Swiss-Prot record, chain A:
Transmembrane segments: none
Name of the encoding gene: Nup85
Protein name: Nuclear pore complex protein Nup85
Organism: Rattus norvegicus
Subunit structure: Component of the nuclear pore complex (NPC). Component of the NPC Nup107-160 subcomplex, consisting of at least NUP107, NUP98/Nup96, NUP160, NUP133, NUP85, NUP37, NUP43 and SEC13. Interacts with NUP160, NUP133 and SEC13. Interacts with NUP37, NUP107 and NUP43. Interacts with CCR2.
GO MF annotation list: structural constituent of nuclear pore
Residues carrying N-acetylmethionine: M1
Family designation: Belongs to the nucleoporin Nup85 family.
Pfam families: Nucleopor_Nup85
Length: 656, 387
C-alpha cells in the first residue's frame, strides 16, 4: 500500500447532526446514500424523532452541470474516434493524427469555457456568477495544462520549434494584451495613451515584434525627438533571427546569426543609444534577456511560465527539451522570489517541464474535481505509447483505472450513462465486468430506455444481463396486469419458467372470466409457443376455442383429447377441459369416436381417483365437492351416451 | 456536399453547436409569415428534474454564405420544464405543441411569440396508466406516441390504451382500454377518423373511431417472429401506403387496402429504427433514423436517372431492390413505394450522418430542411436536402 499523497477532503453535509453519531450509509454507483438511523443507544424508552431525510452524496458533481455535459458528450465522440483510429495508424501520420485529436479535445474545452464565461456574465445573482467564474478558471487551467502536455509529450517538439510552440502557448493563455491593444489603438493619440508603453512591453515580452514595431512607429510619428531611437530599436526587432517553419536553415546557422544580433543589441546598449528614453532602454534590455529587467515586468507577465518563455526567447532560443526543467525551476524560484509558495497548477506545470507524466497525472487527479481531464489525457498519452511500463498495484494499468473511474461517474447520471458504455468497451481488462455490474443497475422507467439497454447488452453477448433485464420488465408488466407484455418479454428472454407463470395467469383469468384476454398475442405466438409446456398448452387451448368457434368440431375434439393424453395440459386443468368436451359430446352427430371416448373416460377416472383426500371439511368445501361430484356425474353420463352412439355408428358403418 | 452542411463541431476557434436538453425529439413548422422561416422544436428525453421542451429557431432560408455553411443563426427561443421524459413531440398548430411524457401525461404548450415564452394551455395528467394488483388506484404508464389533426389529438401508451382528445375538452372524447395486449409504440392518422397503430409484437392495427367497441377493424402483421415495430408514417398523398420501422432495423412498406402482410421488406439499419418519415411534399423521398446512429435518405424517384445523380456525393450510396412478396398490379397511379418490379425499380439510399456513434432518436423533415436529435445530446440540421 502506498502512502496517501494528501489528506482526503472532508465533505460537510448540511443538516446532518454528526454529534449524534447515528449515521448509516450505503454506496451506490457513483454516489452514496446517507441517513440518520432511528436507533438510540442510550435509552430506548425515549424516542428522539430522527431526521426524516436521506442525503444523496454525489462524488462527481460536475457531471450534473448543464454546460459540462457538452464537454462530456463531445469528448466522447473524440475518444471513440481515437480508439478507432488506433487500428489504422502507423508511422509518421500517426503523430499528426494524435496532435489533431489533442487539438480537438482542447477545442471542446475552449468552447465550454467560452459558454461558461457567457453564463457567468449573464448570471443574475453573484453567488452563481462566482461559481461559474471559478468553473471558467478551472477549465482554463485544464486547457493550459493540456496544451503544454501536447507540446511536450505528443508533439515532442525538438530544440528550436519547441520555443515557437511555447510562445504560442503563452500567447494563447495570456491574452489580455488583445483587449489592451484594441483599447490603445482605439484612442485618438495611441502613443499618449497611459497604457501605451505597457502594451509595447507586453508585445515584446510575448515576442510579437512586428506589432511592437508598428507601435514604435506611432511613437516616432508623434514625438520627432525619439524618432531616431525608435527606428534603431525597430530595426533590431526586425532583424532578430527567428526559426520560421518553412526555413531550411540549421540550428547552428540560427545560433550564429542570433549571437551576431545579440552583440549588436549589446553594443547599442553600451553606446547608450537609448539613454534618453528609459522605456526604449528597458525594451532593449528585455531583448537581451536581462533577468532583472524582466522581473521588473512581473505585473505584465502575470505568471512564471510567461517569464520562463520570455527568458528563453531572449537568452536561449534553441533550448533543448532536456534542459527545459532547469530553466523552469529557476524561473519559478526567481518569479516567486520566496514571497509565496507554488500552487497546485505550478506543480503540475513543473512536473510537465520535468517530463514526469505520472506526476502530472497524479497532481491533476488530486487538484481537479472530476476524472474527465485525467482520464482523457492519460488515454491520449497512452496512445502515444508513453505509459506502457507503468502498472498499478491495483486493478490493471493507469489508463484503464482512470477510464473506469470516469465511466462509473457517468453511469450514475440519468442521461450520460450511454457515454460510459463506450469507455467501458475500451477497457480490455475490467471494462466488461464493470459494464455488467453497472448496466443492471440502470433504472428502467420506460420501455424505450429498456430497449436501449437491451441493445447494448445484446451487442456484447451479455446474455445473463439480457435475461435479468427482460425478467425485470416482465415482472413489472405482471404487476401492472399487462399479461401480454409480460409474455412478450419472457419470450424475448427465452425464460421458460416465467412464461409458464404468465401462462398460468392467463389460464386462471380464463377460468374466472370465461374468455381470453390478449388474443392478438396468443393467436400469433408461432414457434415461440414451444418455449414452455404451459405456453404450448395455452396456445393450443386457444386454438381449440377457435376451432370450436369455427364449428370444426372434429378437429377441436381431437385437439382437446391430445392435450390431455400428451400430458401437456396441467392436471389441475383437466376438469375444465373435460367440461369443455361436454357440449361436443352432446352434439347431434357423433364427434368423439369410441376409442376417443374410452380415452376421455380413462382421463376422467384418472382424475377422480387421484383427488386428494381433504382434511377438515367445511361448508364451502362441501359445496365445492358437491358441484364437482355433479360435474363428474354429468360427464360420466354424457360419455356413456356418446360411447353408446359411437359404438352403434361405427358398427353400422363397418357393417354396411 | 451534404456533409458540409451538418452543423457541428469544428477545430479550435469554432464554437460547436450544442444543445441543452437531452435526447431531442422535435418537429418542424412553418411560421405564419410566408417568408418560410422555420422553427424546430426540441424536447428532453430523460429523467425528471432536468427535462424541458425548447423551441429553437433555425433561421431563415437562403442566407447561406458562399461556403454553404451557416453560423450562429440557430437560436434558442424559449424553453419550459417538462415533467418526465419527452417521449414524443408534435406541433398542433402554429403556436401549440403537444408533448407526450413518460409519466403518462399529455401536455399542450402554448407559444407566445410576443414575449417568447411557453406556457401550459391544456394538460391530461393521467392519460395513460396501469391498473394492477400492485397499485392501489393506478400507476402511470409512459405515453409513447401522439398524432395531431386539429382539433383532435390521439395518444397511445405502454398501457395499450388509445385516447382521443379534443384540444378544448378536459375529458377524453374516446378511450379504448386494452386496445393492445402489448405496448403501442406509435400512431398516425390514416384518414380521419381512422388511425394506424404499431405495437411491440409486430402488428399494425387500423382503428375506426366511428365503430364502438375495442376491436380494431383490421390487423396486419409481419410474418412469424413478431419483431416489434417502433414507428409508422403514412404516405402524404396515397393514404393506403404506410411505412413502418422495426426493432431489427427493417423498413416495411404496407398497402393497407389489401393483404395482411407488408408489400415490401427492405433491409435497412442494424438496430432499432426509431423514426420514419415520408417527405411531406416530395413523398418519393423517405427518411429513417436508428439506434445504430445512422440517418438515411431513401430516394425512390430514380426513374429519372439524371436527377438522381445529384445525390451521389453523399457517403454511402447503395442500390436495393424490392423484395416483394405480393404480386399486385396497379396500372394507374402506382406509388413508387409499392411497385414490385425488381429490375426496374430501385431505391437509392444515402447516409446523411458522417460518423456513427450514438443513437439518432428522432427526425423531422420539411421542405429542404431536416432536423434530427441524437443521444449525444446534439441536434443536426441540414437545410439543403435536395441540392
Amino acid at each position: 500500500m502506498e502512502e496517501l499523497d494528501c489528506e482526503p477532503a472532508v465533505t460537510w453535509i448540511p443538516g446532518v447532526n454528526s454529534k449524534k453519531k447515528q449515521m448509516c450509509f450505503d454506496w451506490g454507483p457513483g454516489e452514496m446514500l446517507l441517513c440518520e438511523t432511528s436507533f438510540n443507544k442510550t435509552d430506548k424508552s425515549e424516542k428522539v424523532p430522527s431526521c426524516p431525510f436521506i442525503y444523496i452524496i454525489r462524488k462527481d458533481v460536475d457531471v450534473y452541470s448543464q454546460i459540462l455535459r457538452k464537454l462530456f458528450n463531445e469528448s466522447h465522440g473524440i475518444f471513440v474516434g481515437l480508439q478507432r483510429l488506433e487500428e489504422e495508424l502507423s508511422g509518421k501520420s500517426r503523430k499528426a493524427q494524435l496532435v489533431r485529436v489533442s487539438k480537438n479535445y482542447r477545442s471542446v474545452i475552449r468552447a465550454c469555457m467560452e459558454e461558461m464565461h457567457q453564463v457567468a456574465i449573464a448570471a443574475k445573482d453573484p453567488a452563481s456568477g462566482r461559481q461559474f467564474s471559478s468553473q471558467v478558471s478551472i477549465l482554463s487551467a485544464m486547457e493550459l495544462i493540456w496544451n503544454l502536455c501536447e507540446i511536450l509529450f505528443i508533439e515532442v517538439a525538438p530544440a528550436g520549434p519547441l520555443l515557437l510552440h511555447l510562445l504560442d502557448w503563452v500567447r494563447l493563455h495570456v491574452c489580455e494584451v488583445d483587449s489592451l491593444s484594441a483599447d490603445v489603438l482605439g484612442s485618438d493619440h495611441p502613443s499618449k495613451h497611459e497604457s501605451f508603453w505597457n502594451l509595447v512591453t507586453v508585445l515584446v515580452l510575448q515576442g510579437r515584434l512586428d506589432e511592437a514595431r508598428q507601435m514604435l512607429s506611432k511613437e516616432a510619428d508623434a514625438s520627432p525627438s525619439s524618432a531616431g531611437m525608435c527606428r534603431v530599436l525597430g530595426d533590431l526587432m526586425r532583424t532578430m533571427p527567428i526559426l520560421s517553419p518553412g526555413n531550411t536553415q540549421t540550428l547552428t546557422e540560427l545560433e550564429l546569426k542570433w549571437q551576431h544580433w545579440r552583440e549588436e543589441c549589446e553594443r547599442h546598449l553600451q553606446d547608450n543609444t537609448f539613454a534618453a528614453n528609459p522605456h526604449l532602454e528597458s525594451l532593449c534590455k528585455i531583448m537581451l534577456g536581462d533577468e532583472a529587467t524582466l522581473l521588473e515586468q512581473k505585473e505584465l507577465m502575470s505568471n512564471w511560465y510567461h517569464f520562463l518563455v520570455t527568458r528563453l526567447l531572449y537568452s536561449n532560443p534553441t533550448v533543448k527539451p532536456t534542459d527545459l526543467h532547469l530553466y523552469a525551476q529557476s524561473s519559478l524560484d526567481m518569479f516567486l522570489g520566496g514571497e509565496s509558495s507554488p500552487e497546485p497548477l505550478d506543480n503540475i506545470l513543473m512536473a510537465a517541464f520535468e517530463f514526469d507524466i505520472h506526476q502530472v497525472i497524479k497532481e491533476c487527479s488530486i487538484a481537479l474535481s472530476n476524472w474527465w481531464f485525467v482520464a482523457h489525457l492519460t488515454d491520449l498519452l497512452d496512445h502515444c505509447r508513453l505509459l506502457q511500463s507503468h502498472n498499478l498495484y491495483f486493478g490493471s494499468n493507469m489508463r484503464e483505472f482512470l477510464l473506469l473511474e470516469y465511466a462509473s461517474g457517468l453511469f450514475a447520471h440519468h442521461s450520460l450513462w450511454q457515454l460510459g458504455v463506450d469507455y467501458f468497451d475500451y477497457c480490455p481488462e475490467l471494462g466488461r465486468v464493470s459494464l455488467e455490474l453497472h448496466i443492471e443497475r440502470i433504472p428502467l422507467n420506460t420501455e424505450q430506455k429498456a430497449l436501449k439497454v437491451l441493445r447494448i447488452c445484446e451487442q456484447r453477448q451479455m446474455t445473463e444481463q439480457v435475461g435479468s433485464i427482460c425478467k425485470i420488465l416482465a415482472m413489472k408488466a405482471v404487476r401492472n396486469n399487462r399479461l401480454g407484455s409480460a409474455l412478450s418479454w419472457s419470450i424475448r428472454a427465452k425464460d421458460a419458467a416465467f412464461a409458464t407463470l404468465v401462462s398460468d395467469r392467463f389460464l386462471r383469468d380464463y377460468c374466472e372470466r370465461g374468455c381470453f384476454s390478449d388474443l392478438d398475442l396468443i393467436d400469433n405466438l408461432g414457434p415461440a409457443m414451444m418455449l414452455s409446456d404451459r405456453l404450448t398448452f395455452l396456445g393450443k387451448y386457444r386454438e381449440f376455442h377457435r376451432l370450436y368457434g369455427e364449428k370444426r368440431f372434429g378437429d377441436a375434439a381431437s385437439l382437446l383429447l391430445s392435450l390431455m393424453t400428451s400430458q401437456i395440459a396441467p392436471r389441475s386443468f383437466w376438469m375444465t377441459l373435460l367440461t369443455d368436451a361436454l357440449p361436443l359430446l352432446e352434439q347431434k352427430q357423433v364427434i368423439f369416436s369410441a376409442e376417443q371416448t374410452y380415452e376421455l373416460m380413462r382421463c376422467l377416472e384418472d382424475l377422480a381417483s387421484r383427488r386428494p383426500e381433504c382434511g377438515e371439511p367445511d361448508a364451502q368445501r362441501l359445496q365445492d365437492d358437491d358441484i364437482e361430484t355433479t360435474k363428474v356425474e354429468m360427464l360420466r353420463l354424457a360419455l356413456a351416451r356418446n360411447l353408446a352412439r359411437a359404438i352403434i355408428r361405427e358398427g353400422s358403418l363397418e357393417g354396411s | 456536399m451534404l456533409r458540409r452542411e451538418w452543423h457541428r463541431k469544428g477545430l479550435l476557434q469554432q464554437t460547436p453547436f450544442f444543445h441543452r436538453p437531452l435526447k431531442e425529439r422535435h418537429t418542424l413548422k412553418t411560421c405564419e409569415s410566408q417568408t418560410a422561416c422555420e422553427d424546430s422544436n426540441t424536447g428532453g428525453w430523460k429523467c425528471s428534474q432536468e427535462n424541458c421542451v425548447s423551441l429553437w429557431s433555425i433561421g431563415e432560408f437562403g442566407n447561406l454564405d458562399s461556403d454553404g455553411g451557416f453560423e450562429g443563426d440557430h437560436q434558442l427561443l424559449c424553453d419550459i420544464r417538462h415533467h418526465g421524459d419527452v417521449m414524443d413531440l408534435q406541433f398542433f398548430d402554429q403556436e401549440r405543441i403537444v408533448a407526450a411524457s413518460s409519466t403518462g401525461c399529455v401536455t399542450v404548450f402554448l407559444h407566445h411569440p410576443n414575449n417568447q415564452t411557453l406556457s401550459v394551455s391544456q394538460q391530461w395528467p393521467t392519460a395513460h396508466y396501469h391498473t394492477g394488483p400492485g397499485s392501489p388506484s393506478y400507476s402511470s404508464a409512459p405515453c409513447t406516441g401522439i398524432v395531431c389533426d386539429n382539433p383532435e389529438i390521439v395518444t397511445v401508451g405502454e398501457d395499450g390504451r388509445i385516447n382521443l382528445f379534443r384540444v378544448d375538452h378536459k375529458e377524453a372524447v374516446r378511450t379504448i382500454d386494452n386496445a393492445d395486449s402489448s405496448t403501442l409504440h406509435a400512431v398516425t392518422f390514416l384518414r380521419t377518423p381512422e388511425i394506424v397503430t404499431v405495437n411491440s409484437i409486430g402488428q399494425l392495427k387500423i382503428w375506426d373511431f366511428r365503430q364502438q367497441g375495442s376491436e380494431p377493424c383490421q390487423i396486419l402483421s409481419l410474418t412469424g417472429d413478431r419483431v416489434p415495430l417502433h414507428c409508422v408514417d403514412r404516405h402524404p398523398d396515397q393514404q393506403h401506403v404506410v411505412a413502418t420501422g422495426g426493432q431489427d432495423g427493417m423498413l416495411s412498406i404496407w398497402d393497407v387496402r389489401q393483404g395482411t402482410m407488408p408489400v415490401s421488406l427492405l433491409k435497412a439499419h442494424e438496430a432499432e429504427m426509431w423514426e420514419v418519415h415520408f417527405h411531406p411534399s416530395n413523398p418519393d423521398h423517405l427518411f429513417t433514423c436508428s439506434e445504430d446512429g445512422s440517418l438515411w435518405h431513401w430516394d425512390a424517384s430514380t426513374n429519372a436517372p439524371e436527377k438522381s445523380s445529384l445525390f451521389h456525393q453523399g457517403g454511402r450510396s447503395t442500390f436495393l431492390s424490392h423484395s416483394s412478396n405480393q404480386a399486385s398490379v396497379h396500372l394507374s397511379l402506382v406509388s413508387s413505394w409499392l411497385s414490385t418490379d425488381p429490375a426496374k425499380d430501385r431505391i437509392e439510399i444515402t447516409s446523411l450522418l458522417p460518423s456513427r456513434t450514438l443513437s439518432v432518436n428522432s427526425l423531422d423533415v420539411l421542405g429542404p430542411c431536416l432536423v434530427c436529435g441524437t443521444d449525444a445530446e446534439s441536434i443536426y440540421v441540414t437545410r439543403q436536402l435536395f441540392s
